[in-house]
Every structure is written in structure tokens, then in C-alpha cells.
Amino acid sequence: MLYRLSEKQQTDLRCNKLTVDGFELVKMLKELRLHNRNINFLEFLRGVQIVPSDSVFLGEIDENSHTQDNTTTSILKEKELYDGIPLLPSMAGVSMDPEREKKSELRLMKNQISAIINILFTVVGTVTAVWYCTSSLSIEKKIALCAFSAILVLVADTFLYVRYLSAQPVRTSKNHTRQIIYTWTTNDPVLQSNEQLAIELGAIPSLKEKKNQ
């Protein structure tokens, strides 16, 4: 798999070639990580582009080949050569999948509907219990007690539900160290081999936490 770099990326990676293969890119990223531990890989790798290997000759790209980008993209998707590209948004822990966002919204709506139904059942059950427990009282007093109980239960359940939604996420204890590990697998059609890039960023909130030994 071949990757086209921007001028800024070439400068930062100290590379004089416009295109590099997967192994070269992995090696240069490791070296860059050693020199600059505060680098934001999400921003840095945003402009990396995949190019077909047959459009590269002696390390140079034919600038007119950009007109074939749509066709090239379709071919690459069919050949499943995007193994290394989905990591670009995920390296910062950001999900760009609209399908996942849609599922999250549907899940939230489902939870809200379930909460409303549960609150209604609680109110109806409370009113029914109060009505039968006060059978010896007059109708006016029974109605007043039922109304008071219904309002009290409704306010309490609504308060608890809103409190639950606004609750802060649980924080990890101080005896944990935060560690994030990114794994990048590149399938290079030229070399027919795989290599993994593991980058540890200690200062960024973790996707995987490990206890202090």
C-alpha cells in the first residue's frame, strides 16, 4: 500500500519522497514520536492519501492522476486495502461513524420512553394503593390523598431520572496509570506483508487502563 504525503508531512517526517509504502511510513512515525511526544496524530495524519501502486514510477506521482480518484477509491474499497486508514479519526478516540451516532440517539430515545412508561406505572400503582388503603375515608379525602401521592411520586421519579442523566462519569482511582495503545496494521500489496505500529501516549485519556504494579 502506498501513501501520498503533503509538503508539511514530508518536512515533519524528514522525507524527500512524495509517496511512501506502509513500512516506511510506520518507521518514520516511530522516529517522529521519539522526537516529539506531544504530537497530535489525528491532525498530523489527516491529509494522508492512499494511491494505487501502478500510478507510482520511480517514487514520483503523475499529477494528472487525481482525476481518477473516484475510480481508484472504489477499487481500493473492493480490494479491502483500507486497513490502515480507519485509524485516522479513531487515534484521538473520536468516532466519525454516522451509523454509530444514529444508534446512540435511538438508544437514548428508547431509554427516555422506558423511563416515562415506568414513571406512569409507578404513579398509577401508587394512586391505586392509596385509594384502596383509604377505603374508610370519604370520597373527597380519598381523591385528595390520591392526588397528593401521585404528584409526590411523579416529582420524585422525575428528579431521580434527571439526576441520573446529569451524573458525572466515574473517575478512576489515583493508583491507576492511564495508557493508550494504538495498533495500526497495514496490508502493503507491494511487500505482501503486515507490520503493526503501537504508539503509547501517556498524557492522553486512556482507551485501555492498566493498574500500577
Curated annotation (Swiss-Prot):
PANTHER family for the chain: TRANSMEMBRANE PROTEIN 199 (PTHR31394:SF1)
Physiological role: Required for vacuolar ATPase assembly.
Transmembrane domains' residue ranges: 113-133, 142-162
Domain of life (superkingdom): Eukaryota
Encoding gene per record: vph2
Name of protein: Vacuolar ATPase assembly integral membrane protein vph2
Biological process, per Gene Ontology: vacuolar proton-transporting V-type ATPase complex assembly
The keyword Repressor is annotated on this UniProt entry: no
Membrane topology qualifier: Multi-pass membrane protein
Keywords noted in UniProt: Endoplasmic reticulum, Membrane, Transmembrane, Transmembrane helix
Chief location bin: endoplasmic reticulum
Cited InterPro entries: ATPase_Vma12
One GO cellular component term: endoplasmic reticulum membrane
Keyword Membrane assigned: yes
Cellular compartment(s): Endoplasmic reticulum membrane
